[in-house]
């Protein structure tokens, strides 16, 4: 089994391994910058580590590749019989990360 980790960022959790490219909520880092992500769980073969003291020694590092926008979602509000309707769109800001190491 390969080594992988569960990292927390932007209020979500992602399963990552070395070499993975993932889209996460926007980070305030420039493209090319190195970032470290907080770890929730590490699986190394058959050994599963979830103890907070052991995870404090583990670091998942990555490199910011670019900042992109997610797909457009459309919001539509409507109230019956009053003629009220409102349309709105939203595109979430995302950061593309390449995981460079789990140590």
Curated annotation (Swiss-Prot):
Keyword annotations from UniProtKB, A to Z: Ribonucleoprotein, Ribosomal protein, RNA-binding, rRNA-binding
Domain of life from the UniProt record: Bacteria
SUPFAM superfamilies membership: L21p-like
Record's GO cellular component terms: cytoplasm; ribonucleoprotein complex; ribosome
UniProt GO BP: translation
An example Gene Ontology molecular-function term: rRNA binding
One Pfam family named in its UniProt record: Ribosomal_L21p
Family classification: Belongs to the bacterial ribosomal protein bL21 family.
Function: This protein binds to 23S rRNA in the presence of protein L20.
Subunit structure, as described in the record: Part of the 50S ribosomal subunit. Contacts protein L20.
Protein name per the record: Large ribosomal subunit protein bL21
Organism taxonomic ancestry: Bacteria, Bacillati, Actinomycetota, Actinomycetes, Mycobacteriales
